[in-house]
């Protein structure tokens, strides 16, 4: 029930990066390792977007009402394999992982995060088996000294959200998403 939460600089991918720092003992200036852990977190942070939930070729993902959430198997050098739980629908492919890697990053050679500035331009994404994609380590350099901020407060307003769908078959994609959302709500 806190009214105000004050933190250091935080970002979605930090949950994964923190686990990697703990597990592998990465130091605060091991820029390539930090960039690789951040990339792994970025691939996981939007859940089933990586497993085909918002993929350009969305029809290949199958029954998105039962889509599997992504899993990362991370190596100490920062490379990782992205997969999903067996028996779930969805798709882990070079396409799904690549689209998520580029999602909301701005400049792929200078993706600014609180712990590191990431360069994803030399990352290699390889299909190694069905629903198993290996991602090579990223490059990193020191974090920026300034960063954006976000502040929210309650002031009597309520917000709503819209989802947009683009592409040649956007109407079908939107209908598929709606059907899946209803199925999951009724489950």
Predicted feature descriptions by range:
Residues 2, 13, 35, 39, ...:
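General structural feature for long, well-ordered alpha-helical segments within catalytic domains
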Residues 136-187:
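C-terminal non-catalytic interaction/assembly regions of soluble proteins
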């Amino acid at each position: 029930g806190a009214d105000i939460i004050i933190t250091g600089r935080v970002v979605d991918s930090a949950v994964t990066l923190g686990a990697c720092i703990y597990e592998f003992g990465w130091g605060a200036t091991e820029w390539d390792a930090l960039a690789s852990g951040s990339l792994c977190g970025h691939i996981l942070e939007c859940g089933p977007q990586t497993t085909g939930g918002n993929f350009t070729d969305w029809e290949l993902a199958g029954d998105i009402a039962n889509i599997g959430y992504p899993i990362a198997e991370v190596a100490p050098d920062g490379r990782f394999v992205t997969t999903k739980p067996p028996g779930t629908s969805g798709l882990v492919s070079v396409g799904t992982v690549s689209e998520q890697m580029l999602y909301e990053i701005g400049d792929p050679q200078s993706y600014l995060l609180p712990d590191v500035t990431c360069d994803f331009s030399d990352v290699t994404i390889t299909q190694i088996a069905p629903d198993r994609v290996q991602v090579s380590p990223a490059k990193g350099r020191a974090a920026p000294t300034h960063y954006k901020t976000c502040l929210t407060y309650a002031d009597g307003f309520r917000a709503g959200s819209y989802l947009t769908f683009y592409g040649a078959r956007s109407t079908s994609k939107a209908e598929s998403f709606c059907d899946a959302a209803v199925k999951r709500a009724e489950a």
